[in-house]
């Protein structure tokens, strides 16, 4: 259910998630490389109103693990691997990277429910992160960055969907933008925007006429307690 990119005006979702993330960075062939595993867990409650029966509502709850995500990223231009000493003196500027995010169907899923934490399918996102940095170094307490992420996501089929045989989805194109500013070494905030296009679904070969063309905005507050521990709060 999560990660489809589809906006449904007849669907009301209430989602509470706790997200665990492990990241490992390294240098391969003089390039910065990062490996990340993301595991969400939480609870989802949904209310679906049918367009042809507005007085009928289908309510569903799902709790447990969400789908596991595995992310690989690498520096392609002006993102060299940095030692601790070089990191403190490196001046951020225009830089380009590459990423691949694989989502595995490991989340809680019940074919008898109209909404689930898991999507019961694989997906892969390919993108090219672009960064513009404004500051003396990554440790600049007043560092400002502007990040763009053009990407495309390809989806596998869900062969066990609610009240159907197969659900498929066409590629979803996205452009994410984030303007981030450090207020001091331990607190930062960002304004976030996402434009989505495509991602139309088909149920048993019939189009659901739900191609996306949407723009969403939000804000994020980050608090860093130590080099390895931080808290991030987002609203969208």
Model-predicted segments: where are they?
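Residues on the lipid-exposed face of transmembrane beta-strands in outer-membrane beta-barrel proteins
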Residues: 20-24, 70-76, 100, 126-132, ...
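Surface-exposed strand-loop-strand hairpins of Gram-negative outer-membrane beta-barrel proteins
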Residues: 1-17, 56-58, 111-116
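Residues that define the transmembrane beta-barrel architecture of outer-membrane proteins
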Residues: 12-18, 63-70, 92-94, 118-124, ...
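Short loop/turn motifs that connect adjacent beta-strands in outer-membrane beta-barrel proteins
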Residues: 25-33, 78-95, 135-144, 186, ...
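Transmembrane beta-strands of outer-membrane beta-barrel proteins
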Residues: 33-37, 70, 94-100, 144-150, ...
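Outer membrane beta-barrel transmembrane domains
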Residues: 158-236
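Hydrophobic alpha-helical segments and helix pairs
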Residues: 64-122
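Transmembrane beta-strands of outer-membrane beta-barrel pores
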Residues: 39-45, 76, 102-108, 132-134, ...
């Amino acid at each position: 259910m999560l990660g489809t990119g589809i906006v449904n005006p007849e669907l009301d979702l209430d989602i509470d998630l706790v997200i665990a993330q492990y990241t490992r960075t390294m240098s391969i062939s003089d390039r910065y490389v990062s490996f990340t595993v993301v595991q969400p867990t939480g609870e989802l409650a949904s209310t679906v109103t049918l367009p042809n029966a507005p007085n009928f509502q289908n309510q569903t709850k799902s709790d447990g693990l969400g789908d596991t995500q595995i992310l690989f990223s690498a520096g392609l231009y002006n993102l060299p691997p940095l030692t601790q000493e070089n990191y403190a003196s490196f001046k951020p500027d225009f830089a380009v990277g590459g990423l691949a995010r694989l989502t595995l169907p490991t989340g809680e899923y019940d074919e008898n429910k109209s909404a689930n934490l898991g999507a019961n399918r694989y997906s892969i996102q390919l993108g090219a992160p672009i960064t513009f940095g404004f500051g003396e170094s990554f440790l600049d307490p007043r560092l400002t960055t502007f990040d763009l992420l053009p990407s495309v996501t390809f989806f596998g089929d869900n062969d066990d969907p609610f009240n159907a045989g197969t659900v498929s989805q066409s590629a979803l194109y996205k452009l994410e933008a984030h303007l981030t500013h450090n207020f001091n070494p331990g607190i930062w905030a960002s304004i976030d925007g996402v434009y989505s296009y495509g991602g139309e679904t088909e149920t048993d070969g019939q189009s659901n006429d739900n191609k996306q063309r949407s723009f969403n905005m939000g804000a994020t507050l980050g608090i860093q307690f130590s080099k390895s521990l931080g808290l991030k709060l987002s609203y969208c």
